[in-house]
């Protein structure tokens, strides 16, 4: 049967059986309301429009549809309450409902509000104006200003072209949109300038037809999609805090001849080389359990996910986030001089279609929180780095992200890999997905921009955003979070003959820990993989673990190391490694 739920935002048809309980049917209604941007914290139902007979849902959850007296085609009036910050002055504020907590299992997709990153809060306060010097065209004094020397907005196209900036920064793009969306002189209400695209068909359409694939209308089907190069990028630069990080990552390929995959842990900081730019500062690399081959890798994703959940929590205690991933694609050139084959270039591909899909999936799992978006999230700051051969046959790094359209296409399952790595194949329409017309813009042989039909496949370059990468100008003077990258074996490197055990821990740490020299001990402890291994032993208490992290990573390490050295857990650890 179909029950019609009428709410302040319209009529919602929900399919159900008479034997189902209201608790089983309510999530469908909750999903529909969420799609209208409404997340109620209280729902009451009644058969009268004035709400005189409304009853809170908590007392009705166990009752069946038949027991409630609902029949096919009945109209049930929905009264709900939302947080005042989310109503934006709508009529829903005054519905007079009593607050009732809805159980979390009845709110699909509902999550706690996450906070924006500190770098976003910092850049939001800046205007990003690009200063200009006085020129020959200026007719004023030193204290004057004219159109030839006045500061430029951070999104200025001429400045970007002159400085070879292919993609403007995210915050420059945001300010550009906000400037046109919320004009100060208009005096109208605020409109969120950003919106996360959604290319999925709406299976809860309220336009009077059965859901897809039995029915479709212009309201529930996605519009035609036109792909073009994204003009902005969420992250502008990837900075590895130590060249030894990359050297140790490549060492696995040098020793085994097989490829390697890892995740990058670090922080997002302001990047001064681009107006309102952001850089991902990589402090550590973690390699999950994997089986490596010459042309790829194999991973047990369930095992990897469980392990990464723990690593993410420990990294957070160290002040780090998972900022990206890195993988190798290296083949020795056979010259005996360390050169490698150049596989990725403008005439082949930069990221294959499968790698692009993988990058989009990772970005979707790590959304960027933004209060300027209608949905509260917008794209992602997750980066993808590839270690491969360049045109000079040298080992080099290339850094990328995929566009927000790529994220939406992959989320809607509209594209897949193809036998040509540079082309993305467009999937067919099925009962589970609807694929609209997809086009892409390109320049023809006459230099004119034309629209091409993307089916059956299109160049994956339209989904890729390139980033710059590098190292600190002076690594010796740069304050690094981890003083030591080598010395203690990296995690999951048993294939190289290295294992993390008490013997390795004794060799690396025992003499320094027994000496009582806190300066040397601080340098030894400031090792990402050592800290992870010590935590996995579960010898230290939570308080002792916090002292260890503070003593290893803080500049003021004398006092925490003194307290740690006197703790029973640390003494137990020293006794164990001494007898190893």
Curated annotation (Swiss-Prot):
GO MF assignments: ubiquitin binding; ubiquitin protein ligase binding
Pfam families hit by this protein: NPL4, UN_NPL4, zf-NPL4
Cytoplasm as UniProt keyword: yes
Listed Gene3D superfamilies: Phosphatidylinositol 3-kinase Catalytic Subunit, Chain A, domain 1 (3.10.20.90)
Major subcellular location class: cytoplasm
The entry's keywords: Cytoplasm, Endoplasmic reticulum, Membrane, mRNA transport, Nucleus, Protein transport, Translocation, Transport
Start and end residues of each MPN domain: 238-378
InterPro entries, per the entry: MPN, Npl4, NPL4_C, Npl4_Ub-like_dom, NPL4_Zn-bd_put, Ubiquitin-like_domsf
PROSITE patterns: MPN (PS50249)
GO cellular component, one term: perinuclear region of cytoplasm
Keyword Protein transport among record annotations: yes
CDD domains: MPN_NPL4
Membrane topology, from the record: Peripheral membrane protein
GO biological process: mRNA transport; protein transport; ubiquitin-dependent protein catabolic process
Compositional bias per record (Polar residues), positions renumbered to this chain: 86-104
Region: Disordered, residue numbers: 86-113
Cellular localization per UniProt: Cytoplasm, Perinuclear region; Endoplasmic reticulum membrane; Nucleus membrane
Family: Belongs to the NPL4 family.
Role, per record: Involved in the import of nuclear-targeted proteins into the nucleus and the export of poly(A) RNA out of the nucleus. Has a role in the endoplasmic reticulum-associated degradation (ERAD) pathway.
Name of the protein: Nuclear protein localization protein 4
Gene label: NPL4
């Amino acid at each position: 049967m179909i029950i019609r739920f009428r709410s302040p935002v319209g009529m919602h048809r929900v399919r159900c059986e008479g034997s189902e309980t209201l608790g089983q049917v309510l999530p469908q209604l909750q999903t529909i309301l969420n799609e209208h941007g409404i997340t109620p914290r209280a729902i009451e139902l009644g058969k009268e429009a004035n709400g005189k007979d409304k009853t809170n849902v908590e007392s009705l959850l166990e009752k069946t549809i038949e027991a409630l007296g609902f029949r096919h085609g009945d109209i049930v009036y929905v009264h709900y309450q939302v947080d005042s910050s989310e109503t934006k002055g709508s009529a829903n504020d005054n519905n007079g409902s009593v607050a009732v907590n809805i159980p979390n299992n009845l709110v699909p997709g509902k999550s706690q509000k996450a906070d924006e990153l500190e770098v976003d809060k910092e850049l939001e306060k800046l205007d990003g104006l690009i200063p200009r010097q006085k020129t020959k065209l200026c007719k004023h004094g030193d204290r004057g200003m004219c159109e030839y020397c006045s500061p430029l907005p951070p999104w200025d196209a001429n400045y970007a072209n002159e400085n070879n900036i292919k993609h403007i920064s995210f915050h420059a793009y945001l300010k550009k949109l906000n400037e046109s969306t919320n004009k100060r002189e208009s005096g109208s209400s605020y409109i969120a300038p950003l919106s996360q695209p959604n290319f999925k068909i709406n299976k809860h359409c309220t336009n009077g037809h059965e859901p897809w694939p039995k029915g479709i209308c212009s309201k529930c089907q996605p519009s035609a999609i036109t792909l073009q190069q994204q003009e902005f990028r969420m992250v502008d630069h990837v900075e590895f805090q130590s060249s030894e990080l990359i050297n140790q990552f490549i060492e696995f390929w040098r020793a085994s001849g097989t490829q390697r995959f890892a995740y990058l842990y670090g922080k997002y900081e302001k990047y001064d080389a681009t107006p309102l730019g952001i850089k991902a500062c990589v402090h550590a690399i973690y390699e999950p359990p994997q089986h490596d081959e010459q042309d790829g890798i194999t991973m047990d994703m369930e095992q990897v996910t469980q392990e990464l959940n723990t690593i993410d929590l420990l990294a957070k205690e160290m002040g780090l986030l998972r900022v990206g991933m890195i993988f190798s694609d290296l083949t020795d050139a056979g010259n005996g001089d360390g050169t490698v084959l150049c596989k990725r270039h403008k005439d082949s591909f930069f990221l294959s279609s499968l790698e692009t899909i993988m990058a989009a999936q990772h970005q979707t799992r790590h959304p960027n929180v933004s209060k300027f978006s209608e949905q509260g999230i917008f794209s992602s700051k997750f980066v993808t780095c590839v270690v491969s051969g360049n045109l000079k046959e040298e080992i080099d790094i290339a850094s990328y992200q995929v566009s927000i359209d790529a994220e939406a296409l992959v989320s809607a399952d509209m594209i897949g890999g193809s036998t040509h790595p540079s082309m993305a194949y467009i999937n067919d329409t099925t009962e589970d997905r609807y694929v609209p017309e997809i086009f892409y813009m390109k320049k023809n042989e006459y230099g004119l921009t034309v629209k091409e039909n993307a089916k059956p496949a299109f160049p994956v370059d339209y989904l890729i955003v390139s980033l710059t990468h590098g190292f600190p100008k002076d690594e010796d003077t740069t304050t690094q979070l981890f003083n030591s990258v080598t010395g203690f074996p990296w995690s999951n490197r048993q294939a190289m003959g290295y294992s993390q055990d008490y013997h390795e821990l004794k060799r690396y740490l025992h003499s320094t820990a027994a000496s009582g020299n806190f300066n040397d001990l601080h340098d030894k402890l400031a090792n990402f993989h050592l800290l992870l291994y010590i935590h996995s032993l579960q010898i230290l208490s939570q308080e002792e673990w916090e002292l260890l992290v503070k003593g290893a990573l803080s500049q003021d390490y004398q006092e925490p190391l003194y307290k740690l050295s006197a703790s029973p857990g640390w003494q137990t650890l020293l006794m164990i490694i001494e007898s190893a």
